[in-house]
Amino acid sequence: YEKLMPINSGHKDYVVIVASGYNQGVSPVPLKVYVGMKDRLADGSKIDYATANERDSFLARNGLLYGKLYGMAVENTTASTLVEKVDPGAKMMEEYLKNPNSPDQFAARWYPTSYQWGGWDKTVAVKDTEMYLWKKESEQPKGYTFFNGDKKAEHPAGDPSGLPRYAQNMTKSGALIGVDFGEFDFGNLLNLGNDLPEYLTSNVIKMVPAVDGALTLELGGQGKVKGGDASIHMEKNKAQMIAPDGLYWAKTTDGDYLIVDEDSGNDFGERKYVLTINKDMQVKSGHLLAISGGKHSSRYAQGVSALGGAFTKPGGNEFSGSCPVTALIAKKADGSFYTVEELQGTARQEIRGSKSLSEQTYIGVVQARPESSGDVEAKGGDAGGQIFQFNIKLK
């Protein structure tokens, strides 16, 4: 997996974890979430913490001993409006995202396959888990089909408010979708809240399609590159997302924003940008934050690097995520910093949510393999690059 991200289940007995990534390198596969029940052993029975070992106690408390992976599935009639042919063996999600005329939203359910982990003494080979089951006809839920796509869907980002919804980078196609569960119903049909749900329900929003013209970034007079600028992806010559990887959702007094890192090997400089979204998870605008590296980099043409003497040769860079530190450096009315105890639970987001976007502070990272000589090589470093702090002031 690229990222395992818990989202608020709204229920004391259940956990929900977005499981984005690679399905062991096998396509097609749907987007997935893990649903687990707390205080249960692998067979579903109640755990006795008085006799359980430390490992199982920890896993059971967090709902990780008893659960299943649930994949996005679409009712067959609805699916026929999204793609030309409903086929679990095809990359339907990619077809949907690349079609400029496909619906902007659709309803989906999330169903498990027949596989469920049976415990430490019943472990099977990875190939015998759910990884090959999503496309099998016999595994399709009655009246529904798993809405399979490419294995490469990298970072998700959850709504910081705690609402059960998230944005998902569709890395292979170059798109962004939103998933809104509304309110989880763990007691649907005959379950009555005493076991894992038969399915989850959600609304899916196409936030940025994988279509040329879908995204042109505002530059604020910056972002010049060889022969053009970074308002579009210069190497691909397309005004769209290309290989979006890192993703962070910021909720401020100004509204909601998504910070995106592309990982496309852009010869004209990898892009980091911020998308402004509304309450319905619709993208309203995009602004360039930074570009880095690329074989056409003017910095690399001069043989310079962030760490002196580390330049090797021109090549691609990669931004690697954004970490909010606003609450860690914020001060109280008396001028003192918040204590560790005061920053527990939702406190950090409450502090961030009380400030405007321009008052937020983030830490970012650039992986720069073209800067891997000198001290980086001498110390056996994986790659050069830099750690940087940044603020965002949109104009």
Where do the PLM segments sit?
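Conserved small-residue
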Residues: Y1-K395
